[in-house]
């Protein structure tokens, strides 16, 4: 019953008050970026994802907020595009495969290199440690440490441990994104 009331309230609010936000989703290949977009857009998880070549753009509406998501490929040849697609967005979402400990250092280096770009200063960042359902996945505390997130001082930074497969913490991730729909663009 409460869910029905919340849906009606969201629908009613959407008639009078709409927010739009734009975000860029980046991270190393196979971290789960496209899967994350599919889960928040449709609630569907699929094991059969094809790596993103270049970029994809998708609009997702949650309540009264329309989120324009730029999903950028994570292979080395596409990483030079990250900065271009991160300029002027409300938030940057950085996806990490929390179960692939061998790639965490490379992921940390790519994140810090990206955030060192002057055009991206001040844009809030949400770091998502995906695949928490797998054995030996880093938890939030370990991810914060291994990704050296405490060193990032020029912007708001948040970190959640999620599982797209199990849909763990997708709700709080969406809450964070919706909350930042009012963030100023740089």
Swiss-Prot record:
Keywords: Cell cycle, Cell division, Chromosome partition, Cytoplasm, Cytoskeleton, Endosome, GTP-binding, Lysosome, Membrane, Mitosis, Nucleotide-binding. InterPro entries: Arl8a/8b, P-loop_NTPase, Small_GTP-bd, Small_GTPase_ARF/SAR. It comes from the Eukaryota. Pfam families: Arf (PF00025). The keyword ATP-binding does not apply. It is found in: Late endosome membrane; Lysosome membrane; Cytoplasm, Cytoskeleton, Spindle; Early endosome membrane. GO terms for biological process: anterograde axonal transport; autophagosome-lysosome fusion; cell division; chromosome segregation; late endosome to lysosome transport; lysosome localization; protein transport. Gene3D superfamilies: P-loop containing nucleotide triphosphate hydrolases (3.40.50.300). GO terms for molecular function: GTP binding; GTPase activity. GTP binds at residues 29-35, 71-75, 130-133. GO terms for cellular component: axon cytoplasm; early endosome membrane; late endosome membrane; lysosomal membrane; lysosome; spindle. CDD domains: Arl10_like. Residues 1-19 dip into the membrane without crossing it. Small GTPase which cycles between active GTP-bound and inactive GDP-bound states. In its active state, binds to a variety of effector proteins playing a key role in the regulation of lysosomal positioning which is important for nutrient sensing, natural killer cell-mediated cytotoxicity and antigen presentation. Along with its effectors, orchestrates lysosomal transport and fusion. Belongs to the small GTPase superfamily. Arf family. This is ADP-ribosylation factor-like protein 8B-A. It comes from Danio rerio. The lineage of its organism: Eukaryota, Metazoa, Chordata, Craniata, Vertebrata. The gene is arl8ba.
């Amino acid at each position: 019953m409460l869910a029905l009331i919340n849906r009606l309230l969201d629908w009613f609010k959407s008639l009078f008050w709409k927010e739009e936000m734009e975000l860029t989703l980046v991270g190393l290949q196979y971290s789960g970026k496209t899967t994350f977009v599919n889960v928040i857009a449709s609630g569907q998880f699929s094991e059969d994802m094809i790596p993103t070549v270049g970029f994809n753009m998708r609009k997702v509406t949650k309540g009264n907020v329309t989120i324009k998501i730029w999903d950028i490929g994570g292979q080395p040849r596409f990483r030079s595009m990250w900065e271009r697609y991160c300029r002027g967005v409300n938030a940057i979402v950085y996806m990490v495969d929390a179960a692939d400990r061998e790639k965490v250092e490379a992921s940390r280096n790519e994140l810090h290199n990206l955030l060192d770009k002057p055009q991206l200063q001040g844009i809030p960042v949400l770091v998502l440690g995906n695949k928490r359902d797998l054995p030996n996945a880093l938890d939030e505390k370990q991810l914060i440490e291994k990704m050296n997130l405490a060193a990032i001082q020029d912007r708001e930074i948040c970190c959640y441990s999620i599982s797209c497969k199990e849909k763990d913490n997708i709700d709080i991730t969406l809450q964070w994104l919706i909350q930042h729909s009012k963030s100023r663009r740089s």
